[in-house]
């Protein structure tokens, strides 16, 4: 289960899928471009705006993933998680028949192994729609006209763009020297935690026998 598009989650999984020992993965739960964005935004006929749209996607992809300064794992070849899942032909979101993992589509306990169950708490369909709307707004601000149907390039650009949207909510790091600084820092954390990217994350309870674990 990849709960959300964050570099500290995605980059490690990308390294696994880029290797040769990934056959132990039978299924992936992950809400990517095809699960979040309605097909009408990538199924339009090409027209005079297509070349311009491709340049916008190229710009986003060329910037790649935002990485932390001290992060050792990175994307060497600009390959996104969604693209790798498709290329490796790994079943995606089987519990939701390939659609987005959300509380409305996976309503009951889902048995992933003998005596091991997952109960989806979130996101909701509304959270998914809200993230889609935010992404569309960001793309429109770039004068994107939604005239590209290349799912691979769209998937890659989408993941990179979402990471940057999340960064908008991140609180700037600063040294806490006084109580007032601490309150500002806490306030910043609250704003970050309420971002649409975090609200659209997959949250769930993992159950095994009489034990429950919250993720």
Go through each PLM region and give its residues.
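Flexible, acidic/histidine-containing loops and adjacent segments that form or flank the divalent-metal
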Residues: 15-212
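Residue-level marker for buried hydrophobic side chains located in beta-strands
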Residues: 1, 213-215
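Metallo-beta-lactamase
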Residues: 1-8
């Amino acid at each position: 289960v990849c709960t959300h598009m964050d570099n500290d989650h995605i980059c490690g999984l990308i390294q696994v899928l880029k290797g040769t020992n990934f056959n132990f993965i039978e299924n992936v739960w992950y809400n990517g471009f095809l699960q979040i964005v309605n097909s009408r935004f990538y199924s339009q006929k090409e027209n005079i705006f297509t070349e311009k749209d491709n340049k916008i996607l190229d710009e986003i992809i060329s910037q790649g993933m935002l990485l932390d300064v001290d992060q050792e794992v990175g994307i060497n070849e600009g390959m996104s998680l969604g693209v790798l899942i498709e290329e490796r032909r790994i079943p995606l979101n089987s519990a939701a028949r390939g659609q987005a993992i959300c509380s409305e589509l996976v309503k009951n306990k889902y048995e992933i192994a003998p005596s091991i169950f997952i109960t989806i708490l979130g996101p909701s369909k509304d959270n998914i729609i809200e993230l889609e709307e935010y992404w569309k707004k960001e793309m429109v601000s770039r004068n994107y006209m939604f005239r590209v149907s290349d799912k691979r390039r769209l998937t890659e650009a989408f993941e990179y763009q979402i990471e940057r949207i999340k960064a908008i909510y991140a609180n700037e790091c600063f040294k806490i020297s006084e109580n007032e600084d601490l309150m500002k820092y806490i306030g910043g954390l609250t704003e970050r935690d309420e971002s649409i990217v975090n609200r659209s994350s997959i949250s769930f309870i993992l159950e095994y026998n009489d034990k429950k674990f919250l993720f």
